[in-house]
Amino acid sequence: MACLSPSQLKKFQEDGFLLLEGFFTADECVAMQQRIGEIVAEMDVPLHCRTEFSTQEDEQLQTQGKTDYFLSSGDKIRFFFEKGVFDEKGNFLVPPEKSINKIGHALHAHDPVFRSITHSPKVQALVRSLGLQMPVVVQSMYIFKQPHFGGEVSPHQDATFLYTEPLGRVLGLWIAMEDAMLENGCLWFIPGSHTRGVSRRMIRAPSDSGPGTSFLGSDPAWASNLFVPLPVRRGGLVLIHGEVVHKSEQNHSDHSRQAYTVHLMEAAGTVWSPGNWLQPTPELPFPPLYS
């Protein structure tokens, strides 16, 4: 059943995250993985777009904010790569399918397989059971977490990058395409951390000025013992509150940890910050989730 029970809703409200095991079938996961394989096989990335995507905090401005390729990807399907996968001439040092960190940020809009999954009746029923009245899809990503060098994702709150007024209007759906275990970089959360507001925001600069983005505020030094791991079997879905603190470790294993993620916003009574890096465009306004 796609709808949350009262006890599940209560747990999500208390913790800021919730695991729903077996939400998607193996066949649905296979369909998404096969489609991603086709997209990667057809990938033709110009040399100037071979941008190393880093999840290390101290490199974020350089690799994300200053790169037009990233900042203009909100309404497109684009490829972002792991560090060290190109030589100095921009040639692949590893097989191309092993080089990608993620594909973003509009699979939900431009690909029929991912559009169907994103707007599936059971996803709609799940989100309705959370009480969202007018949810819109703001972004989607396919994350690879490659074996041996799939990068660490530092502790963060999604609302740092996807800020709304009031807060509490962003919801992440994290779908495991493969088993996500301790060995290959599963998610970790600080339960209850979604009740403390947002400590930092990434702001997009005006197009005619300086670096692409900057940060306002700073994150506290979250103690490592506050985090709890959340292993997820293939097909599981994790609900993620926009302000809950979460992270993942580098993948040192022999197995990838692929996931499809979607971020939603409750549009009713909500202002999407004009300072967010991601903005709706005339070509792609944020599409309603509900049919």
Curated annotation (Swiss-Prot):
Cofactor requirements of the protein: Fe cation
Top-level taxon in the UniProt lineage: Eukaryota
Chain residues that bind Fe cation: H156, D158, H246
In-chain residues carrying the UniProt-annotated modification Phosphothreonine: T55
SUPFAM superfamilies for the chain: Clavaminate synthase-like (SSF51197)
EC number: 1.14.11.-
GO terms assigned for molecular function: 2-oxoglutarate-dependent dioxygenase activity; metal ion binding
A Pfam family per the record: PhyH
Annotated residues for binding of 2-oxoglutarate: K102, M141, H156, Q157, D158, W174, S248, R257
Membrane-traversing stretches: none
Cited InterPro entries: Phytyl_CoA_dOase-like (IPR008775)
Keywords of this entry: Dioxygenase, Iron, Metal-binding, Oxidoreductase, Phosphoprotein
PANTHER family per UniProt: PHYTANOYL-COA DIOXYGENASE DOMAIN CONTAINING 1, PHYTANOYL-COA DIOXYGENASE DOMAIN-CONTAINING PROTEIN 1
Function: 2-oxoglutarate(2OG)-dependent dioxygenase that catalyzes the conversion of 2-oxoglutarate to succinate and CO(2) in an iron-dependent manner. However, does not couple 2OG turnover to the hydroxylation of acyl-coenzyme A derivatives, implying that it is not directly involved in phytanoyl coenzyme-A metabolism. Does not show detectable activity towards fatty acid CoA thioesters.
Protein family: Belongs to the PhyH family. PHYHD1 subfamily.
Name of the protein in question: Phytanoyl-CoA dioxygenase domain-containing protein 1
Classification lineage: Eukaryota, Metazoa, Chordata, Craniata, Vertebrata
Gene (UniProt): Phyhd1
